[in-house]
A protein has these predicted regions:
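Flexible, glycine/charged-enriched surface loops at secondary-structure junctions
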Residues: 36-42, 144-145
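Active-site-adjacent substrate-binding region
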Residues: 53-96, 100
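A short beta-alpha structural unit
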Residues: 11-16, 40-55, 78-80
Length: 145
């Protein structure tokens, strides 16, 4: 027995420069071209991507500060998650540096964890060092501007 309908929720992470409405139009055009004009699309939300240059004084300040506290610095121009970061970078013209330092897992899950004090076998910062690093970052950012 086949159901009379099927539904799917699709989350698209857009690159900088691609407008959410334009992306939706491209998806609609692709489905139509493939013979799926009968598929209904309901837009539930959306916002533009955001990116701050790795050369930005804010990013360089974060890298220099976090290097004091963590042995492995991983710079990612974009993150896999989504948030309306464009409000800062596009509308306000401010650099945004989404950062994380230390060891954690299970983000946004009931079993999300963060280490208070990592063991010697973990090359990551614990809670106290993370707090110190964020204070140092604010000072480094003030000096960089």
């Amino acid at each position: 027995i086949l159901p009379h309908k099927a539904t799917a929720k699709v989350d698209s992470r857009l690159p900088p420069g691609l407008d959410p409405d334009e992306a939706l139009q491209k998806i609609r055009a692709f489905l139509d071209d493939q013979g799926y004009a009968d598929i209904e699309i309901r837009k539930l939300g959306g916002y533009p991507a955001s990116q701050t240059s790795v050369e930005s004084p804010a990013v360089q300040a974060a890298i220099s500060v976090f290097a004091k506290y963590a042995s492995d610095i991983n710079v990612q121009p974009r993150i896999a998650g989504s948030a309306p970061f464009y409000q800062f970078t596009e509308r306000l013209g401010l650099p945004l540096v989404p950062t994380g330092m230390g060891f954690g897992t299970g983000a946004h899950a009931p079993n999300e964890i963060m280490l208070i004090e990592p063991g010697d076998d973990i090359a990551a910062a614990g809670l106290a060092d993370i707090e110190k690093a964020y204070v140092d970052f604010v000072y480094a950012l003030a000096d960089a501007e």
